[in-house]
């Protein structure tokens, strides 16, 4: 039996391959280090729902937190209050609504809404994707996570909200950045995974498989204008999300997957 048209428009592997090739490029380490999601996406372009939820995350006692503490507080709250589920592929506002209602949310959904919470809390942030090559079908494919800039450590650090983890090297007090992670993995040096939660939540084995065992190729997602994407995803919601993304790519308004070039 032939597959329905909707499958070909949303899940056909060839469409993913074409899109991946169109948006992928190699970029210098300095350009990747300098990129920041906040440069494109400003506070006043983030929907009011994020500010409303932000008031639930932070109380008056949180006012004096540093950027690392704020970033951790947001990540813990989201993980504790969103059970996750199927991928959403909606505008950031609709995605947040659905996630809060227990209607889904995968790693890319967590990364997207986390980026917006970072913006409204003056935390510099990036969204990363990762192409994973593995014989394990639960690992092979893709994954999303974030990076935040911590003035406390004077560096970017990886944070995976969906998995609720930081990554470390020998110094267990300072998380590593994505570029450090790539270098350490290439050199086959020690990388440790630790829970964001102070209570030491059990780390899912899938996190070890994704970050330590698979052949991973991280890329930073750039040129993502959240306000513009939200507008088109809402206005063209009768189209499959892959078609909406494809339209924006073809008119030169799409995002890029930028792979570090050493």
Regions found by a protein language model. Give the residues of each.
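Charged, often glycine-rich, active-site loop that binds/positions anionic groups
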Residues: 96-104, 140-147
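Secondary-structure boundary elements
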Residues: 17-102
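Alpha-helical and coiled-coil interaction segments, frequently adjacent to or embedded
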Residues: 176-262
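Alpha-helical transition-metal enzyme core signature, strongest for iron centers
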Residues: 78, 107, 111-114
